[in-house]
């Protein structure tokens, strides 16, 4: 949670093959709640803003699920559920995201964007699980600028993200030259250098792959 609220934090613990790693569980506050309650601000950028919180939830999911090893999603994390664990008491009934008396998450366009991002990220993971398991994994996950690189014969990936609250520049380390694609937008670029400086707004992240999505 420290990383997503904008206070720094190392997220390398998700790279584990001996146990299931997770961002949320039954006995911890939700990431969304932590961001809304304790998020850091800088100028006009405020992690406590609901829309910004949801954008950062997408970024967190990319950096969690695209590290090697088994992963868990705690219920409704894919919708950026942000109700406190202590609402109505620790074991009290919590509002559901659906139904006439629920939170309306499934009718909320922005919550659905989070759901769709989770789905796409997990699709990428599942389609390239051999690469995540057998490929060369490199990462820098302790600062506000974070990066993951996977280098495998059949699949290569570079993920960059700004977990801070101010615009910053990261040097993206691509494992090979040639054509690369932004996973979400499909935008292509031809690399002549493996180390590329990229300006990132706060909360901005990109997943680059050497194959266009769906190919």
Spans of features found by a protein language model:
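A structural signal for well-ordered alpha-helical scaffolds and beta->alpha junctions
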Residues: 19, 57, 111-118, 173, ...
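Aromatic- and acidic-residue-enriched segments that line the glycan-binding/catalytic groove
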Residues: 88-96
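Solvent-exposed beta-hairpin/edge-strand motifs
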Residues: 173-187
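Active-site rim elements
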Residues: 42-54, 99-112, 193-196
């Amino acid at each position: 949670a420290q990383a997503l609220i904008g206070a720094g934090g190392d997220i390398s613990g998700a790279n584990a093959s001996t146990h299931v790693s997770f961002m949320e569980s039954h006995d911890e506050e939700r990431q969304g709640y932590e961001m809304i309650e304790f998020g850091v601000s800088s100028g006009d950028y405020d992690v406590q803003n609901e829309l910004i919180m949801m954008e950062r939830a997408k970024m967190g999911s990319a950096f969690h699920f695209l590290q090697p090893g088994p992963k868990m999603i705690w219920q409704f994390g894919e919708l950026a559920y942000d109700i406190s664990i202590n609402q109505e008491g620790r074991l009290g009934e919590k509002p559901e995201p659906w139904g006439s008396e629920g939170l309306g998450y499934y009718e909320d366009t922005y919550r659905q964007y989070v759901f769709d991002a989770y789905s796409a990220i997990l699709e990428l993971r599942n389609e390239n699980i051999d690469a995540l398991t057998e490929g060369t994994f490199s990462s820098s996950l302790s600062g506000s600028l974070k990066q993951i690189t996977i280098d495998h014969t059949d699949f290569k990936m570079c993920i960059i993200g700004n977990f801070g609250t101010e615009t910053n520049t990261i040097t993206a380390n691509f494992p090979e030259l040639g054509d690369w694609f932004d996973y979400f937008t499909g935008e292509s670029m031809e690399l002549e250098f493996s180390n590329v400086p990229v300006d990132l707004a706060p909360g901005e992240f990109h997943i680059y792959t050497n194959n266009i999505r769906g190919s």
